[in-house]
Amino acid sequence: MRIISGTKKGHSITSIKNSEVRPISDKNRETIFNILVHGKEIINSDFTLEGCNLIDLFAGTGSFSFEALSRGSHKALLIENNNEMIDVIYKNAKKLDFLDRIEVKNQNACSFDNDDNHKFDLAYVDPPYGKNLAKRSIRNLIKKGMLNDNAIIVLEEEIKTEKSNFDELELIREKQIGISNFSFYKLI
């Protein structure tokens, strides 16, 4: 895995061999960021990637956050509850010189607290497939007021999973790649 674009373009991202870890592929990450930067649905909203604060739920290796930071995002909060993956996140952040732009919380992505009253412009939600965690994690973000009015939520789910619907969100774009479905939402 590597950073696709921005100030750290071409730098490698470390992962681990673990059957429970499913890092987003370079191709899928590139597609998501092309939509975030060039997609007409996103351009017509008030969202901009540059300077945004993001939250990465089920952060894994942190590759999504590191790609966003390389492309000009301001700060990232990564939520991950696997200690081995948290070590990988810190190794990657150190290697990419992003330690001062990230915060990592070892907490459950479906119930963590926003003690610092952070507000986010971008949320990336990539729960383990087949565990029905998407709705709970996104509802936690909404319930605790963690999203700015112009926030974009990117949800990755397995294609065969029943699509998540949210009364508080508008689905503005979907993209299927391989076995993954990417849904882009904004607050209503």
Model-derived regions, located:
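Class I S-adenosyl-L-methionine-dependent methyltransferase catalytic core
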Residues: M1-I188
